């Protein structure tokens, strides 16, 4: 009987695609595959609406919303975001990049979102397109076999163990990195060992007029702050610093966060009359990646595959983009098995390209040479427009943008070399440090 049951299970798995996680990556993938007629089960460990950080979106999210049919609903519940403000105490000024100045003029704005609301919109959209959705159930393991379906095990909120079988598994488990951890392919990213702490505030002072919804990136001595205005009147504020900075804090997290805010005059001024809502949250070991994003019967999407840094608000965009590319790959694997290997290679290449395009800037954002370039924008050969296009999420652009980004990189290296040469020739005193790097 057991052998008969196993044969029946292999012939008739519970679903074509099992999606682990119901955040932006998982819900996007599930919606697209269900729309194409696949039997999809999506399981989320929490229950929507639930809190999540990563509230700032990019203009290139807009065509993805259009494709999913959710743009109007997102717009009704969100704060318009027209650009990015960089604030540098080392230069004594602020610089704003408006998305309308990008090479592609079709998407001149984006949104700041409450992730509890936004993620629920995506989750319900997947269900509306035909995916079977389950909440409050944590997936604990996935077993693969060469000649049969994958076997998935989870535990629901009542402690009951549940099992499913599927022809294909999409790991969208976020920072839990279910498959990357299980398969031993998760690696910390040594180039960006950051951590973050953040909270939400009422009555924070915002920018005036149309710029009210812009994200502010504020540098300070130990890293940088984000300042994200939300449509309900609250503002998300977070500090991203080297992990070592948090280890010697010597006090509780809330008091430490207040002291770090006080050390940044720009943020302290904006929060002078503000009131914190809820507790301070910390997230460590920010950057990591999986050495492979796919296998014979699985793919990883979103944070389950990699996470770099939130400085350019790429998290949700990359998650949804991986969802689109991932859904295409999975659809090919299921409908045209002979082309599965090529489809997965294409997915791997697209994932690496999107991550590498953004990461080059992220790895260098704290370097004086990069700060100098961002704080002194010049549109030589339309390079500023190309950088704006990248900041808007245009990571799969053609040669028109890529060629200008290569020129920007060349100028960065020249600027960095000049800065290092200056330091070697004329060492500065500590009291002159701010002047030297400005």
Predicted region positions:
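Beta1/beta-strand and adjacent pyrophosphate-binding region of the FAD-binding site
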Residues: 9-23
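FAD/FMN-dependent oxidoreductases across multiple families
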Residues: 77, 245-329, 335, 341-345
